[in-house]
Amino acid sequence: MKKLAISIGDINSIGLEILVRSHEELSKICTPFYFIHESLLNKALKLLNLKLFNAKIVAFKDDKDYEFNFIKKENSLEIYSFCLPLGFKVDENFEIQAGEIDAKSGLYGFLSFKAASYFVYEKHAHALLTLPIHKKAWEDAGLKYKGHTDALRDFFKKNAIMMLGCKELFVGLFSEHIPLAKVSKKITFKNLSIFLKDFYKETHFKKMGLLGFNPHAGDYGVIGGEEEKIMEKAIAFVNAFLHSKKDEKFFKKALKDENLQKELLLNFKGKGVYLPYPLVADTAFTKTGLKNCNRLVAMYHDLALAPLKALYFDKSINVSLNLPIIRVSVDHGTAFDKAYKNAKINTKSYFEAAKFAINLHSKA
């Protein structure tokens, strides 16, 4: 079975309860490794009045060298250690504060995530599954990252792409956790062309649509203008480049050379993988719109995620593309209001994320 490294997220959230309640079923389709120290796990289990059997847990430690070892088997738990350069001393000796934003919990969740990420990178597991963190807790812990995807870009020095959804609808985000006022400045021919090229090469979706940035997709330049001035040109260029089968070196050169761009367009015949014009966003998510195209790219976060979650909240997942590791996540937050209350929780997104990671690795 495939091995999944699972980071604990924010220990004050519903993440640990999702993990424990799902463990038996999850273990039927993969071998999970949970990145949490035994002492902290026991505190959480006591608060939840739950038990965890036949599980593998990984205690992580800051060290200059990478080392993975089996430590012991105790109370039906297999305990391992993973040493690596984390940049912070690991402190697992703090109290769980259910539903509260806490810097210690934030830092611990980050280190669990970083350790699990490199565990996969070092080939000890096949994919990474992350449970939800709280961005304010990360900020209070002095961390510079706005979330998992932002951190993964820094870890691996790659331009990670965030994609969310399910088999009925997937959406790639051109921009993520940035203020809306900054999005238009980010939309350049170069930035968008690189994104569209990378998004296709990571997914190989056969038909994709780019959602308009402005209302009515700009109405032929009447509103805004990004669609006609930038987006249509980037779509045409990327479609022509992908059709040409030319290499990355040529792509980088053509980005700066209008003559090469014209040459590509002249030689391009037929349909591209991207629809030629930006789609009007307010109709793209209707039944008719999704029947036409259900693999989309959005210029900003809420343009895609508001309708996605309205339609498929229970089973949507988060996938990080364009990285040296496979990373998936649940598509929901910390749900502090439900944490440690034995409330009814939906684990469908968690299972869908795990299954997606397993299938993706099998196809690799």
Curated annotation (Swiss-Prot):
Signal peptide: none annotated. Its main location: cytoplasm. Gene3D superfamilies: Isopropylmalate Dehydrogenase. Its EC number is 1.1.1.262. Pfam families: PdxA (PF04166). GO terms for biological process: pyridoxal phosphate biosynthetic process; pyridoxine biosynthetic process. It is found in: Cytoplasm. GO terms for cellular component: cytoplasm. It catalyses: 4-(phosphooxy)-L-threonine + NAD(+) = 3-amino-2-oxopropyl phosphate + CO2 + NADH. GO terms for molecular function: 4-hydroxythreonine-4-phosphate dehydrogenase activity; cobalt ion binding; magnesium ion binding; NAD binding; zinc ion binding. Pathway: Cofactor biosynthesis; pyridoxine 5'-phosphate biosynthesis; pyridoxine 5'-phosphate from D-erythrose 4-phosphate: step 4/5. A divalent metal cation binds at residues 177, 216, 301. The keyword NAD applies. Substrate binds at residues 148-149, 309, 318, 327. Its cofactor is Zn(2+); Mg(2+); Co(2+). Keywords: Cobalt, Cytoplasm, Magnesium, Metal-binding, NAD, NADP, Oxidoreductase, Pyridoxine biosynthesis, Zinc. PANTHER family: 4-HYDROXYTHREONINE-4-PHOSPHATE DEHYDROGENASE (PTHR30004), D-THREONATE 4-PHOSPHATE DEHYDROGENASE (PTHR30004:SF6). Catalyzes the NAD(P)-dependent oxidation of 4-(phosphooxy)-L-threonine (HTP) into 2-amino-3-oxo-4-(phosphooxy)butyric acid which spontaneously decarboxylates to form 3-amino-2-oxopropyl phosphate (AHAP). Homodimer. The active site is located at the dimer interface. Belongs to the PdxA family. This is 4-hydroxythreonine-4-phosphate dehydrogenase. It comes from Campylobacter jejuni subsp. jejuni serotype O:2 (strain ATCC 700819 / NCTC 11168). The gene is pdxA.
